[in-house]
Amino acid sequence: MTTTVTSSALIKIHGVSDIGKVRKLNEDKFSISNLSVKDSLNTYQGEVSKDGCLMLVCDGSGGDGRGEIAAKLAVDIFQKEIFTNEQEEIGIGARLINAANKANEVIWKCSKSNPSIAGMASTLTAALVVPPQVYIVEVGDSRCYLVRDGAITQVTRDQSMVQMLIDGGVITPHTAKIHPYRNIVLQSLGARVSVVPVITSLELAQKDRLLLCSDGLSKNLPEEKMLEIIVNQEDVVIASQQLIAAANDLIADDNVTAILAMIEGDAFAKAEKAATLLLSETADGDLSEELEDLTSELSLIDEDIIN
């Protein structure tokens, strides 16, 4: 008689969004979904189905409530595309890219057809956990972090002006925090007719935590403080609330959103046996070429400002 051993894939996820102490509107939106039932939640604890669990954070911009509309559209359209287009043959990365492109198309067309919401846009960072992997798609500067073995790693790379200056050796990460270009995002959904979504995938391990957040958290709360909160509090509900509170205690000049997930179950490797952190990082197109127009305009600005 043969005994079949079934591996388990468990996840605990909780999301929190806060208006902060300065803004009049919350232009951040987020969602958590168990794809087997195609729901939209603030929290989920249970099995990760073969279809996976989806988390996404969107940070809207445009002023006068436009950002709130853009972020909601981004969440709704992206999620709908993932729910309704489950063609496994095209691959998970392609599904995420297609969904991001569709969200961009809808926001762009809405913005161009209605003067009252012209100029609206939104970032998007989404993570789809399909054991033992997580696939992350990014447009903009909302971040995804991995916490493993007492260390925190930024998985995504900000698509921002200061990140380009850091990559070019022009400024340091410390200088970027106070740089006059620190709020310039190089691409976002709805800002242009097309975007270049960036896909990253990695193998998850037991006890890993994933943190998705808007820049209201990442720009205001140091990574060492994020790590301290996450490793000292195993309850993802309490930890996510503590992250928001800590960011608000420091500056609170922006909306703040965080989704925190804990990975469990023997479907995931032991941490010491997990593969190299970044298994792949690809873009559907050349991001540097797509952003050439914007960066050439900025290059005309006084060099003293850049430095």
Where are these regions (language model features)?
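PP2C/PPM-type serine/threonine phosphatase catalytic domain
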Residues: 1-307
